[in-house]
Amino acid sequence: MTNPSALTEAEFNEVKQHPVFSYRMVQKIPALNHGAKLAVLQHHERNDGSGYPLGVKAERIHPYSQIVAVADVYHAMTSERLYRRKQSPFRAIETMQREQFGKLSTEAVAALVNNLIGLQTGAVVKLSNGEMAEVMFIPSDEPARPIVKIIETGQLLSLSVQRDIYIEEMVQG
């Protein structure tokens, strides 16, 4: 999509049909199991029924679809768009952890976080304020908000307390 302006309601309704068109394309492929085909159809569904194209709730959304939905949201947040800048992976993970309840599978979000965050004690990161820091401690409940030591000053900073600063990128793992 190359339209820099907001979609009209009619255009958005057309966009919301892409899972149906995609499902029809893969429906007769014998190499794909039923769950994989449903993931194509349901990857924009949300647990609270607010998704599309069917508006079904959690109990009717296939587990594969819930996994793909989490990956799709993460990809959308970390990709550059005409209408907004991409977010850092850490910022995206933090947002997903905060806003997942009722929308996304908490298990799928946790799996993404655990496999993607890749932070280790001793890693060097660039913070949103431009400072470089070393990861000192990673809390299990907020892995995207560790305690870091500012390299220039030696000051310890808890990103779970200092909420206006976040990890922009990994510099050295």
Task: Go through each PLM region and give its residues.
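Histidine- and acidic-residue-rich, metal-dependent catalytic cores
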Residues: 1-173
